[in-house]
Every structure is written in structure tokens, then in C-alpha cells.
Amino acid sequence: MKQGKLIRRAVSAALAGCMMFTLSVPALAESTDALMQLSTAAKSAVSVLGEKNGTLKIGNNSFDTETNINEQELGGGTISYDAETHTLTLNGVNIEDSSGDWVIDFNDTDTLLNLVLMGENLLKGKGGIRAHDLKISGTGSLQITATNYEGIAGIGQSGDNLTIGSDVDITAMNGCAIAFNGSVRIEQDATVKAKCLYGGIDCYDLTIDSATEVNLESTGEQCNAIYVRGDNDGTVAGTANIKNSKLVLKSDYPA
């Protein structure tokens, strides 16, 4: 299968350059049905239509992305938002909300959302976080449980981007852990763990640089722990660069 060969070549080339990695067998499975992994990712593109650009939803609360949110209590912790730098700070929150599709939804296609973590933070809902361009940093940690959709997702447009520089743990019962139609970067000693039905990471361009550990488990049949593609159809290989990082992958079939 041409698609499978392209994907295997790209991933194999990336893994060959790793300074340190550990593979759990079976790992990096070849998917014979790429649409399975893209089905819930498409939810992002469809549901964003008709929504007002420039809104930040946190649980059942809705805010304007150009208005500051002074520190306020939420979910047993506090949240705050700096509209000038578009920085959302979570400090020890435990937010469980299924009133919408996403616990945190940053609907601004022109702006990077800086998510800063302090303390231990927990999010649980249909989907975890959706944003077109997202950077996660801070000394805290984030645990996401998504019952219906992705743990962290873009909006389904080309150019979606995610950077993770903090500890993140994702459980996605019926979707991908991370799905972006663009780049995903894990860095700065971050530990990222995920257990999901579909792809652990599904993106066009993957970089893992100096991460403490990236541990991904995909439980679905014919699904990948890492699925790097160059287009929506999965017929073009994407790019993966991994170095100075420990990588542990488990999926349905061996590579």
C-alpha cells in the first residue's frame, strides 16, 4: 500500500535519528483506514463553523478574547486571562463540564493562545482543549479526560499548531489524544502521556526535542500511536524529527 510505505519511511527516518527512544511492541502501526483517525478530528472543523470568532469558553463560561479576566475562582482553583498577551493561566483547577463539545475552546483563528499551568490541573468533558494555535507551558501539570472527542485538537484548518513544554496526561476514550492539521512540538523536558482510541499524535509535522518522555498508547484496531501525514487523505508522508527524548509507543500492529 503506497500510503503505508510513505508513512513507514518517514517515521523510520525520524526514529533513526533519535538519541534515545524506547519502543513498546506493537508500535507505530500502519493504518489501513486513515479516515478512522480523521473522523473525530473533522468534528473540530465542522463545529467551529457559525461560532463567533474571538471567544474563549471555559466550561460553561464564555469570555471575549480581547478582554482581561481578572483572577477568579473556578473548579477549586483559579483562572486568569491576559488579553494583551492572550495568556490563560490555570492554577489548580478541576473542571468537569459536558455542556459543550470542549472544556476549553479558544475560537480565535488569528491568535496564539498561551496556556500557563500552575499546580495540578484536571479537565474532563466531551473534548479537552480546542485552539488553532496553542502553546502549553508553566511549572504545573495538566490531566485531560475526553469522553467523546480529542484530548487536544486544532480547529481542523491547515496551519493548526501545538507546542507542549509542560507535563500533560491525556485519556481520549473515543478519539485521538492530540490531532492538529499542522505541527506538533514537544520540548523543554516535558512528559506527555496518552491513552486513546485512535492516534496518540495525529499531525502533519512532528518534533520531539529534549522531552523527558513521550508515552503513547492507541487501543483501536488499525490505528497508530503516531500518525504523521502530509495531507488530509494520508497519501503524502509528513515529517517527524525526534532527538534527545525517550519515546514509548504502543498500538495495534507493529510498524
Question: Can you name each region flagged by the protein language model?
Answer:
Residues 6-13, 20, 28-255:
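A composition-driven surface/loop motif
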